[in-house]
């Protein structure tokens, strides 16, 4: 294989308000704790089971840090795209520690707020135009999903098209 891919996609809920810190360089970083859950019914007992995984997310992109600081709260539902990285450090007792995190670098990664418990409703951190991307109007679609027409006096795009095929 010529290359490799390191991409993580999560849709989950924040377990706490974002933690915002400043680095020595003056750059700001947001740390998020995101829970993803899966549920199933036990075949033998019929009992409903649930398993929750907790993920550490670190955001280095200043614009996304601002979005996290202003709009995200405990319980907010988010869509995250980032890269998996493992950090290694030595604690106060001299023991080596490891932490695996989903990292959103300055120019890579995505954070989209989805409607849900936190009261947020489909705001996207990415750019976008009035025909799609950006705000998705309720968080039901992300990543280009369904397009909506802009509101206002503009005519719809299809009004300019002729119904007849020219050949």
Curated annotation (Swiss-Prot):
Residues of the DNA-binding region: 54-60
Record domain SSB: where: 5-111
Origin superkingdom: Bacteria
Stretches the record annotates as Disordered: 118-167
Disulphide bonds in the chain: none
DNA repair as UniProt keyword: yes
Keywords for the protein's UniProt record, in alphabetical order: DNA damage, DNA recombination, DNA repair, DNA replication, DNA-binding
InterPro entries the record matches: NA-bd_OB-fold (IPR012340), Primosome_PriB/ssb (IPR000424), ssDNA-bd (IPR011344)
A cellular component annotation (GO) from this entry: nucleoid
Bias-annotated ranges (Gly residues): 118-146
Chain ranges for the short sequence motif Important for interaction with partner proteins as given in the UniProt record: 162-167
GO molecular function terms listed in the Swiss-Prot or TrEMBL record: single-stranded DNA binding
GO biological process terms, semicolon-separated: DNA recombination; DNA repair; DNA replication; SOS response
Residues spanning the signal sequence: none
PANTHER family listed in its UniProt record: SINGLE-STRANDED DNA-BINDING PROTEIN
NCBIfam families (alphabetical): ssb
Quaternary structure and interacting proteins, as annotated: Homotetramer.
Function in brief: Plays an important role in DNA replication, recombination and repair. Binds to ssDNA and to an array of partner proteins to recruit them to their sites of action during DNA metabolism.
Protein name according to UniProt: Single-stranded DNA-binding protein
Organism of provenance: Caulobacter vibrioides (strain ATCC 19089 / CIP 103742 / CB 15) (Caulobacter crescentus)
């Amino acid at each position: 294989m010529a290359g490799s891919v390191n991409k993580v996609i999560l849709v989950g809920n924040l377990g706490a308000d974002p933690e915002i810190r400043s680095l020595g360089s003056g750059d700001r970083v947001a740390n998020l704790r995101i829970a993803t859950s899966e549920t199933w019914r036990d075949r033998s007992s019929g009992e409903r089971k649930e398993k929750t995984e907790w993920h550490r997310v670190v955001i280095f992109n200043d614009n996304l840090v601002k979005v996290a600081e202003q709009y995200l709260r405990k319980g907010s539902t988010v869509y995250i795209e980032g890269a998996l990285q493992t950090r290694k450090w030595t604690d106060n007792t001299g023991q080596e520690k490891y932490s695996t995190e989903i990292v959103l670098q300055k120019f890579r990664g995505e954070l989209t707020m989805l409607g849900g418990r936190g009261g947020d409703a489909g705001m996207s951190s990415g750019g976008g135009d009035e025909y799609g991307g950006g705000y998705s109007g309720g968080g039901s679609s992300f990543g280009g999903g369904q397009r909506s027409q802009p509101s206002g006096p503009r005519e719809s795009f299809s009004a300019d098209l002729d119904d007849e095929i020219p050949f």
